[in-house]
């Protein structure tokens, strides 16, 4: 019986990414697979695919878990598991080494705050410098009032605004991670959408963009806008107001949270945010939905007690 050719796990995993994932998943997801490959190369450069056991695989996860939280270890496990299951189905390994894997990890660090309450948001918006052409502050105003993703907001041109009907058309994003930038498709089909804006925001941006051509980008001018720079500006404003800082994505969460708390339906919120389905919205904002359910329960009990 001929001997199996020795194949290193890291080499198989790299080839598996190229064959099965490249061109099939988003660039961000693909980068996560390559990051998993980088960690695997550091942790287990000499582990062979032919002889990998459950013990070997568990040791890889345990080593990774020493410096990462449990959720991150779970993501690492899912990335590797897909390749090993395929290897098992192809007969390259005799059994599934990922079976009954135990996911460990460092103690989770204190969760950063995700959103502002309504009072804090009002203070935040008042603090924005809208009397100048400071692109970042105008960007923050737009995201706070629309819930757009950072890349969606950066991808807006003047012609995406319909000031007469007070709407914004979202059909593309801006690749802010690349030095040269460039337009990219939206995150999913549901992210292509037209959303309503309030009359005040419409008037503000009508004035702000009056000197721009229809195809001019609104926020990206002669230099790149970094996510970190925007987050730093948010942090500066929050500290001035004695508010715990959030991120630019936290402004999107703030927008959605306020809509939920004012009784807007999950279906309408999912459509406005560009979520693929309502499940995504429900899972993301479960804590707020549960808070509302508790408030409703209290109202019901108080009402019944009065009968």
Predicted stretch roles:
Residues 124-127, 179-184, 283, 287-307:
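DNA/chromatin major-groove-contacting recognition/catalytic segments
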Residues 89, 141, 145-148, 152, ...:
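C-terminal catalytic core of tyrosine-transesterase DNA break-rejoin enzymes
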Residues 155-207:
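Conserved tyrosine-mediated DNA breakage-rejoining catalytic core shared by Y-recombinases
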Residues 88-97, 163-166, 172, 207-215:
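Proline-centered turn/helix-capping motifs that create local helix->coil transitions or kinks
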Residues 74, 89, 93-154, 164:
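Basic, Lys/Arg- and aromatic-enriched nucleic-acid-binding interface segment
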Residues 5-13, 17-92, 131-132, 224-228, ...:
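N-terminal core-binding DNA-recognition domain of tyrosine site-specific recombinases/integrases
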Residues 3, 7, 50, 93-95, ...:
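DNA breakage-rejoining catalytic core of tyrosine-based enzymes
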Residues 198-243:
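Active-site/catalytic core of tyrosine-dependent DNA strand-transfer enzymes
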């Amino acid at each position: 019986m001929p001997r199996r050719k020795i194949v290193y796990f890291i080499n198989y995993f790299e080839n598996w990414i190229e064959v099965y994932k490249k061109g099939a998943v988003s660039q961000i997801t693909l980068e996560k697979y390559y990051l998993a490959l980088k960690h695997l190369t550091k942790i287990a450069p000499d582990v062979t695919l032919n002889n990998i056991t459950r013990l070997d695989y568990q040791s890889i996860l345990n080593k990774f878990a020493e410096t990462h939280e449990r959720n991150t270890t779970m993501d690492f496990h899912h990335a590797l598991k897909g390749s090993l299951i395929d290897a098992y189905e192809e007969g390259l390994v005799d059994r599934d080494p990922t079976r009954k894997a135990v996911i460990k990890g460092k103690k989770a660090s204190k969760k950063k705050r995700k959103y502002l309450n309504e009072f804090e948001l009002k203070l935040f918006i008042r603090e924005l410098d809208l009397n100048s052409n400071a692109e970042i502050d105008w960007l923050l105003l737009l995201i706070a009032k629309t819930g757009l993703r950072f890349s969606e907001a950066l991808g807006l041109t003047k012609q995406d605004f319909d000031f007469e009907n007070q709407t914004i058309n979202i059909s593309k994003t801006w690749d802010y991670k690349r030095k040269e930038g460039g337009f990219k498709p939206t995150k999913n089909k549901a992210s292509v959408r037209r959303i309503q804006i309030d009359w005040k925001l419409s008037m503000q941006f009508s004035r702000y963009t009056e000197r721009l051509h229809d195809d001019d980008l609104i926020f990206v001018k002669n230099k790149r806008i970094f996510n970190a720079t925007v987050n730093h500006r948010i942090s500066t404003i929050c500290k001035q107001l004695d508010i715990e800082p959030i991120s630019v994505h936290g402004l999107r969460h703030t927008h959605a949270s306020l809509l939920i708390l004012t009784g807007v339906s999950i279906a309408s919120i999912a459509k406005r945010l560009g979520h693929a389905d309502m499940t995504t919205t429900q899972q993301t904002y479960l804590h707020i939905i549960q808070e509302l359910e508790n408030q409703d329960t209290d109202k019901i009990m108080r009402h019944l007690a009065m009968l």
